[in-house]
């Protein structure tokens, strides 16, 4: 599982979903959580926090947002050398096989379909951590 001091960026255009994700993370013990309302704002925060000790260590992003979709942000993250191994979880209502395949091919760490339970959310974060921290 991600250490409790992990710096997490939550990106969703719906404040209620951002609050749900933040509250779920807080209930799991995480405190260092920032948020963005769309992919563009998320990218700006990633760029602002790009020096050692300030970098985000986990991104949880919605797929469908204005300005920049989560999948487009994921592709930019994976194309940037410094972020190539950044755990990136897509949280979305998209569950069609083609969309899941597209996300996997783009390098998503885990894919969580809304609505989700706290248990599924935690299990997916554990899997994302394991994927990026293989011994």
Task: Describe the predicted segments one by one.
Residues 22, 72, 95-110:
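Alpha4 helix (beta4-alpha4-beta5 surface) of REC/receiver domains from two-component response regulators
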Residues 50-60:
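Active-site beta3 strand of CheY-like receiver
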Residues 62, 92:
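Active-site residues of response regulator receiver
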Residues 65:
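Receiver (REC) domain active-site loop signature in two-component systems and cognate sites
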């Amino acid at each position: 599982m991600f250490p409790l001091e992990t710096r997490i960026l939550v990106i969703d255009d719906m404040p209620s979903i951002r609050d749900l994700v933040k509250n779920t993370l807080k209930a799991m013990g995480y405190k260092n959580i920032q948020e963005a309302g769309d992919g563009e704002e998320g990218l700006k925060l990633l760029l602002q926090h790009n020096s050692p000790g300030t970098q985000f260590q986990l991104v949880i992003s919605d797929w469908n947002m204005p300005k920049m979709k989560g999948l487009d942000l994921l592709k930019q993250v994976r194309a940037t050398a410094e972020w190539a191994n950044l755990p990136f979880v897509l949280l979305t209502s998209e569950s069609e096989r083609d969309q899941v395949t597209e996300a996997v091919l783009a390098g998503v760490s885990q894919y969580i379909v809304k609505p989700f339970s706290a248990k599924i959310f935690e299990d997916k974060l554990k899997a994302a951590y394991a994927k990026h921290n293989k011994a």
